[in-house]
Amino acid sequence: MKSLITQVTRSGQVESFHVGYGVIVDASGEIVKAYGDTQYSTYVRSSAKPLQGMAVLRSGAYDNFKMTPEDLAVICSSHSGEPIHTQTVSQVFSEAGIGPELLACGIHPPIHRPSAQALQTAGVAPQQIHNNCSGKHAGMLATCVQLAHSPEDYLNPEHPVQQYIYDIVKEYTSSDEIHRGVDGCSAPVFYLPLQKVAMAFARISKQENQECCQIFQAMSGHPHLVGGEGRFDTALMKSYPEKILSKGGAEAVSAAGFIMPDGQVYGLAVKVLDGNYRAIGQMVLK
C-alpha cells in the first residue's frame, strides 16, 4: 500500500517531502481505501474532541444548562482565541454556574494574531480562556457539575468525568482498553490505530443516534467556532456545508467524517509521520 506523500517544491524542484499514513472506512470500520499502515497507532490529540464533547450530551449537562449548538461547537474546538470564541466559552461557564478560574489547561496567547495583538495593545495578559482547548475543559467542568463530581483534579485520568469520557471513546472506537497519555493541555489523550479513529468519525457523521446528530450538526453548522480564521478544519467544513466533520490535532494528526452525494458516509484519519502540520491539509484532501 502506498503511503501519502506531500512534496515541498522551490522553483520547480522538490526541496522536501513529508510521508504520512491514512485510511478511509465506513461506519462498521471496513476499510475502503488505505494509504500505508492503517493500524499505525498515534496519540489522537485534539481529534478526540468530538468524542470528549459527547460527555456533555450524555451526562445531561447540555439539556440541563440549556446549552446551544454554538456552545457544543466550541466545546469540541481547538479555537483560535478570537473574541467570539472566548465569549462562547464564557457562556458555557455561565450556563453551568461556574467560573473560568477552575480551568487547568494552561495559558498561551490567542492563535489568532490580530486577537493576540489586541490584547498586547490593551496591556491585557492572556488568560486560560484564550487557550485553544478551553472549550473542551469548560465542557469537562460542566459535566462535573452535572454529575455532582468535584472539579478538583478534574484532569486526573482516574477522575470520574475522565473515566466517563474514556468509556465513550472506547465505545465509539470499539476498543476494550486504550493507552492514555497527557495532552498538551494536561487532559488525558488517547493512543489509537488510525482505522479506529476513522471509524469513530464515520459513526458520528452517519448520525446513528441523537448525540452523534448533535455533535455533527453543531460542528459542521458552526465551523468558525471549531477553529477560526485561516484554520484548515474551518475552511474545509465551510466548503462543504453540513456534509463534513473535520477535526485536526497537534503533531499533524487529523480525522474527518463526510457524507457523499449518494448518501454514503465514510470516515478518514491521517497522520503525518514527522509531525509537521504544514503537510496535513494536502494529505487530507488527497
Can you describe what each PLM-predicted range is?
Residues 35-43, 75-79, 123-131, 182-188, ...:
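A short glycine/serine-rich beta->alpha loop
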Residues 202-286:
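Structured C-terminal helix/loop/strand segments within mature extracytoplasmic catalytic/sensor domains
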Residues 17-22, 138, 166, 251-254:
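Short glycine-rich loop/turn motifs
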Residues 11-14, 130, 243-248:
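Short Gly/Pro-enriched turn/cap motifs at secondary-structure boundaries
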Residues 1-39:
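Beta-lactamase-like hydrolase cores
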Residues 68-177, 203:
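Active-site-adjacent helix/loop patches that line small-molecule binding or acyl-intermediate pockets
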